[in-house]
Amino acid sequence: MTVQTKTKGLAWQEKPLSDNERLKTESNFLRGTILDDLKDPLTGGFKGDNFQLIRFHGMYEQDDRDIRAERAEAKLEPLKFMLLRCRLPGGIIKPSQWIELDKFARENSHYRSIRLTNRQTFQFHGVPKAKLQTMHRLLHKLGLDSIATAADMNRNVLCTSNPIESELHRQAYEYAKKISEHLLPRTRGYLDVWVDGKKVQSSDDFLQEDEPILGKTYLPRKFKTAVVIPPLNDVDCYGNDLDFVAISDGNGQLAGFNVLAGGGLSMEHGNTKTYPNISLELGFVPPEHALKAAEAVVTTQRDFGNRSDRKNARTRYTIQNMGLDNFRAEVERRMGMPFEPIRPFKFTGRGDRIGWVKGIDGNWHLTLFIESGRLVDEGGKQLLTGVLEIAKIHKGDFRITANQNLIVANVAEADKAKIEELARTYGLIRNDVSKLRENAMSCVSFPTCPLAMAEAERVLPDFIDELDKIMAKHGTSDDYIVTRITGCPNGCGRAMLAEIGLVGKAVERYNLHIGGDREGVRIPRLYKENITLPEILAELDDLIGKWAAERNIGEGFGDFAIRTGIVKPVLNAPVDFWDVSKAVAIARA
């Protein structure tokens, strides 16, 4: 089967389609035979195409890798269960919804936890197949769903979390919701399978369905969108396929958006045809044209994106293949209007404001630091219970941040003391969290992620403990370095926008990247390859010592590494990301 498309001049067009394209074409608008698999008691998982199709419904099949070998020895299949990721544009959720979600996690998930993600939503881990319809029906009852939070669609739309400029944030959040809804699939397959629980009986039913934006075969690959309000880059906007940078009119109102496209952080070890890249500027649009711009970028990627090689199918590769000017021109043609010139903007940081902050409307917002976003009652901590107890009395809302933290938002002055008392009682407010730890992040990795090559979430606390000691040794404890660990090169931990990024290479081994910046606008350079955590700490001890002794006033670690030539900056990732001659430490090794 070869590509049949109206587009011309793309080298991949005459190559065979990837099998995922066949799968989508034959899926009956994402229904497949999922309902049949739900009735099969012989396996805890899904068979054939359904293994992939459930991803379009916001789920991944996983197993507990800690006991995989043990179960194999006992002639048992892996302990299979599902990860579910909710669709939650901007990360806002009501306390009443949270109470019900907490109950489900405790009663029906293997790990009895809720994981806050860096895409501003939550995940259930370890949900057995028999509980999936129960879970989706609960989400539906709560006004939530998980459609399009995975697979080849526009994923959960991010929006700057900290609501200091309340009116501007409200307006930006409304557009995040509108963009999310506008780019959703139109198929009823999700409802038919998970809520109604019935098969479509006639082929005529399929003739009535259409996907005017995504198309019958949806997008070539995953697609990520964010709305960001400068000067805070908490959503890491340069790592997304599509970004809307909210521009104020000077009076706290939304003037419009700068539109950026082509960011993405995944790669494949040793494959120089893959690379992370920051998003590029297309132009400015007024608010009323934001949806047109979103649709135009998505449909351009739909029609020009690589459907032969999934490793080169993201928007950044489409822009590289077409050229930025041609990509922009095609988007403008589809919008029916040209972009205006980019409006000036600047980012000054991207960490969350931990603690209490007062909004301009007089309400208070408490940002709770949640290490790696994991809410669970274990190891003497009752973080999950703490959030539940707050939810029982909170009159505002919760906001999940893109840094895996939780904001107890819109707290009245009269309720502030009680909220803080509960947070302290359950360990949600701690006095021993360093700035370094507040600015660290990890993906989930072992034991549930099937792609994990090395630990991430489970080693982050101890790794930061050791890095804190190094910071103290060199007199920099009052400062921070944006540090991220990801268990494989797929980019979920956003290590490719960190000052210090660890990327899993094999069991207990990582590639060490340095030279990103605090604002999240530069890709870090590979510094040392395939080394252990103790070896990484030894390298960082030396480098942090140099930073402490030789840095300029206010100079971050990543900027120092670039200025002093420890590594050369990644200036044009498609060309120089893999250029090891610019990784000074490797060249001299």
Curated annotation (Swiss-Prot):
It is an enzyme of class 1 (oxidoreductase). It comes from Neisseria meningitidis serogroup C (strain 053442). Alpha(8)-beta(8). The alpha component is a flavoprotein, the beta component is a hemoprotein. Keywords: 4Fe-4S, Amino-acid biosynthesis, Cysteine biosynthesis, Heme, Iron, Iron-sulfur, Metal-binding, NADP, Oxidoreductase. Its EC number is 1.8.1.2. Signal peptide: none annotated. One of its GO terms (cellular component) is sulfite reductase complex (NADPH). Its cofactor is siroheme; [4Fe-4S] cluster. It catalyses: hydrogen sulfide + 3 NADP(+) + 3 H2O = sulfite + 3 NADPH + 4 H(+). This is Sulfite reductase [NADPH] hemoprotein beta-component. Gene3D superfamilies: Sulfite Reductase Hemoprotein, domain 1. Pfam families: NIR_SIR (PF01077), NIR_SIR_ferr (PF03460). Binds 1 siroheme per subunit. Binds 1 [4Fe-4S] cluster per subunit. [4Fe-4S] cluster binds at residues 443, 449, 488, 492. PROSITE patterns: NIR_SIR. Pathway: Sulfur metabolism; hydrogen sulfide biosynthesis; hydrogen sulfide from sulfite (NADPH route): step 1/1. GO terms for biological process: cysteine biosynthetic process; hydrogen sulfide biosynthetic process; sulfate assimilation. InterPro entries: CysI (IPR011786), NiRdtase/SiRdtase_haem-b_fer (IPR005117), Nit/Sulf_reduc_fer-like_dom_sf (IPR036136), NO2/SO3_Rdtase_4Fe4S_dom (IPR006067), NO2/SO3_Rdtase_4Fe4S_prot (IPR045169), NO2/SO3_Rdtase_4Fe4S_sf (IPR045854), NO2/SO3_Rdtase_FeS/sirohaem_BS (IPR006066). Component of the sulfite reductase complex that catalyzes the 6-electron reduction of sulfite to sulfide. This is one of several activities required for the biosynthesis of L-cysteine from sulfate. Siroheme binds at residue 492. GO terms for molecular function: 4 iron, 4 sulfur cluster binding; heme binding; metal ion binding; NADP binding; sulfite reductase (ferredoxin) activity; sulfite reductase (NADPH) activity. Belongs to the nitrite and sulfite reductase 4Fe-4S domain family. Coiled coil: none annotated. HAMAP family: CysI (MF_01540).
